[in-house]
C-alpha cells in the first residue's frame, strides 16, 4: 500500500462495469471485502426468497424505506468497525455515501464502461440479471438511475464520486488505474 492510502474504498457504478473486479483487486491488497448488497442478500435468505436482481432492488428499497436511506451502509460499517480497512461495493444511494463520508479515510470510486461492453460482461456471468437483450438491459439500468431518496440513485452516486475510472480496456489497464488509488 502506498503512504496515505484510504482506509475505506467505496465502489459505485454501472452494472457490469467492473466493481466486483475492483473489489477483488483491493481485497488482494489487504482490504477486507464488503458489499452493501450482502445486507440485502441476508434479508432475502432470511425470508426464503430467491436472490435475483429484481428482488435485490425491491428489498433494498424496502429496507431503506423502513430503516432509513443509509441503513445498508450503517449495517455494513457495524461489521467493519471503526479501525477496519475495507473495500465496500454496491453503493447506490447518496445517503449511503453521506454516512460513509463521515467515516475517517473514505474515498468513493465510480466504475463505468460502455453499455455494450457491460452487457457482454453481464451475459458471461450466467446470473439472473433480468435482462435478456441489450434493450432490456438499458431499460433496467434506467430504473436504477434515480429511484428517489430511499431507493437506488446510481446517477447521483456516480456524480458524488471522488474519481471516475472507465474500465474499457484490458484487465491490466484497469488494474493500473486502480493502483493509483491504493
Please provide the spans of the model-predicted regions.
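Conserved phosphate-donor/acceptor-positioning beta-strand/loop module used by diverse small-molecule
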Residues: 89-90, 100-132, 165
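P-loop (Walker A) phosphate-binding loop of NTP-binding proteins
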Residues: 14, 26
Amino acid at each position: 500500500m502506498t503512504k496515505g492510502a484510504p482506509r475505506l474504498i467505496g465502489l459505485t457504478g454501472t452494472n457490469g462495469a467492473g466493481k466486483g473486479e475492483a473489489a477483488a483487486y483491493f481485497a488482494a491488497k489487504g482490504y477486507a471485502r464488503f458489499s452493501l448488497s450482502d445486507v440485502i442478500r441476508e434479508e432475502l435468505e432470511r425470508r426464503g426468497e430467491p436472490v435475483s436482481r429484481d428482488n435485490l432492488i425491491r428489498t433494498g428499497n424496502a429496507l431503506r424505506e423502513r430503516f432509513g436511506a443509509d441503513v445498508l451502509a450503517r449495517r455494513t460499517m457495524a461489521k467493519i468497525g471503526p479501525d477496519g480497512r475495507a473495500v465496500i461495493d454496491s453503493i447506490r444511494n447518496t445517503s449511503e455515501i453521506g454516512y460513509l463520508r463521515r467515516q475517517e479515510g473514505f474515498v468513493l470510486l465510480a466504475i463505468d464502461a460502455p453499455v455494450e461492453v457491460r452487457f457482454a460482461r453481464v451475459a458471461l456471468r450466467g446470473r439472473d440479471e433480468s435482462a435478456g437483450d441489450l434493450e432490456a438491459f438499458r431499460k433496467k439500468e434506467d430504473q436504477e438511475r434515480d429511484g428517489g431518496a430511499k431507493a437506488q440513485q446510481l446517477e447521483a452516486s456516480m456524480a458524488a464520486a471522488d474519481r471516475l475510472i472507465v474500465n474499457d480496456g484490458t484487465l491490466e489497464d484497469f488494474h493500473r488505474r486502480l493502483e493509483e488509488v491504493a
